Amino acid sequence: HGHILPEPSQIPRFMKDKNLFWIDEDKKFMRQGDWSRPINSSNFFIKEKIEWMNQHRIDHAVMLCLSQLYCNGWEEQDCIDGIRFQNDFNASIQTDYPQRFTCGFVVQPRYIQHALKEIDRCVNDLGLKLLCLPSHFLNSKGEWLSTAEEDLDPIFELANKYSLAIQIHPYDGEKMIALKNKYWRFH
């Protein structure tokens, strides 16, 4: 799988203003609060991604949501707005380049009613068929819960109704899995 980053100008202003997520204007770092990660290749952006795929003879790729935009710990309205941005962005990539990309969409399990509405929107309005979920999430009490919690069965039931593929992204993998960060990378 891969990721496509939005151009800095595509990210809604509120996300940077609230320290939720942004990309520096020079495209060298993506940031969230005090966290930052270097953007070590220009092929995280659409034009360069397609050039890279052509160079390596990759016809079609699966693009997943950024784990930073799973919105863990975000207030409800920020979460709704952030997820809508991520899903609309991924849908635009899939719509503009349907022969090149299958893109995922994300929902936040903490806000289950919104999650169910967003699944409906992403499938019926945006044509997305790959649901991306975090392995665990922060509930309203600040506790980490597994996405496999029984209370979240409606998410999986709706995904099953729509025959969605589901990708579970491990959060904080380096804290849970004792593998060297040599042949793969936690992100």
Task: Annotate each PLM feature.
Residues 1-187:
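Helix-coil boundary/capping segments in enzymes
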